[in-house]
Amino acid sequence: MSLPTEVETPTRNEWGCRCNDSSDHITIAAKFIGILHLILWILDRLFFKCIYRRLKYGPKRGPSTEGVPDSMREEYRQKQQNAADVDDGHFVNIELE
């Protein structure tokens, strides 16, 4: 019973990247999808309040207040303003003296 004395080791050119042929259709599609995903993610982060508010309420500015007394409308506006203030509250304003 003899032990193997030679070990197969890959040569340096086998360690190299085999994806140099970037004309492969799958590679091109993956790059395109990746770039598109990045652009959509950036737009979503920039405009998430506008997008989701529009999806929730449609093209109008908010839920309808038809038939609601003025006092309740004002109370609703105050709640909405307070909710917007709380939502923006995760940003820290540092004032230097």
From Swiss-Prot:
Sequence ranges on the Virion surface membrane side: 1-22
Transmembrane segments annotated in the record for this chain: 23-43
Activity regulation field: The M2 protein from most influenza A strains is inhibited by amantadine and rimantadine, resulting in viral uncoating incapacity. Emergence of amantadine-resistant variants is usually rapid.
GO molecular function: monoatomic ion channel activity; proton transmembrane transporter activity
Keyword Nuclease: no
UniProt cross-references to InterPro entries, sorted A to Z: Flu_M2
Domain of life: Viruses
Residues the UniProt record annotates as site (Essential for channel activity, possibly by being protonated during channel activation, and by forming the channel gate and the selective filter): 37
Segments on the Intravirion face: 44-97
Membrane topology: Single-pass type III membrane protein
Record's keyword annotation contains Transferase: no
Family the entry assigns: Belongs to the influenza viruses matrix protein M2 family.
Domain text: Cytoplasmic tail plays an important role in virion assembly and morphogenesis.
Functional summary from the UniProt entry: Forms a proton-selective ion channel that is necessary for the efficient release of the viral genome during virus entry. After attaching to the cell surface, the virion enters the cell by endocytosis. Acidification of the endosome triggers M2 ion channel activity.
Name of the molecule in the record: Matrix protein 2
